[in-house]
Amino acid sequence: MKLKLLAKPIAVIGITLIGTILFILLSQPNQPSSKTDPMARSFVLWLHGLGDSGPANEPIKTLFSSPEFRNTVWSFPSAPSNPVTCNYGSVMPSWFDIHEIPVTADSPKDESSVLKAVQNVHAMIDKEIAAGTDPNNVFVCGFSQGGALTLASILLYPKTLGGGAVFSGWLPFNTSIIEQISSNAKRTPILWSHGMADRTVLFEAGQAGPPFLERAGLSCEFKAYPGLGHSISHEELQHLESWIKTRLQSSS
């Protein structure tokens, strides 16, 4: 479940559960400088997928070259190494346990390990807010297992944040979590993107997300990408950049 960044959504690269995957960084043309309203400090927390690492995902931030991101602090933490059930107990970077691959809408959930991971994510967010960042300028994003953790972290955070972006993720909890979602958390917008050719986290697992969020009282924008497998396309990241830009709060 390591991140693969594809130039085109129709290009699909096969993956193995514990193999290494080539990370392709797309070069971007220089953006002309422009005068914009003063932007306050913002924070983007990116959570990687199973078996991956934070540093391997850091090149993503170079794609966000708009002036609105000049005061953005990026964080790419790495998951701790844990035994993973779907990989026969192999120890690898993992935010929480996963019981089966492919992940479907009905896959078993390990809520206890998810909640432990959520506490760690909340600590990262709390630290940034304590440093002076407006919660409305805090964005949590994640791919695959990191996307599932993004969702859980957003829903259980006691404050309204700028937004949460889920890429090829799934619901890592049961419907009972709805009772734990605060009114503030329900005001945090969600962007959910999923490849229709995903054979690791099936598209049906992604499709189950928006109806659940709607029942919970949250706003979710769901985008399906035909031909895209278990990876992230340039198109998805371009939309993420635009989506965050429209939600950033200025310092004025």
Please give the residue ranges for each predicted region:
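A domain-start/cap signature at the N-terminus of enzymes
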Residues: 2-44, 53-55, 72-73, 208-211, ...
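Serine-hydrolase catalytic machinery in alpha/beta-hydrolase-like enzymes
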Residues: 28-137
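Short, proline-enriched alpha-helix->beta-strand connector loops that line the catalytic pocket
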Residues: 136, 184-190, 216-219
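Primarily recognizes the serine-hydrolase "nucleophile elbow" in alpha/beta-hydrolase
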Residues: 129, 134-185
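Short beta-strand/loop motif that positions the catalytic acidic residue
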Residues: 191-194, 198
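Conserved alpha/beta-hydrolase "acid-adjacent" motif
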Residues: 55, 199-205, 233
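C-terminal catalytic histidine-bearing segment of alpha/beta-hydrolase fold enzymes
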Residues: 207-252
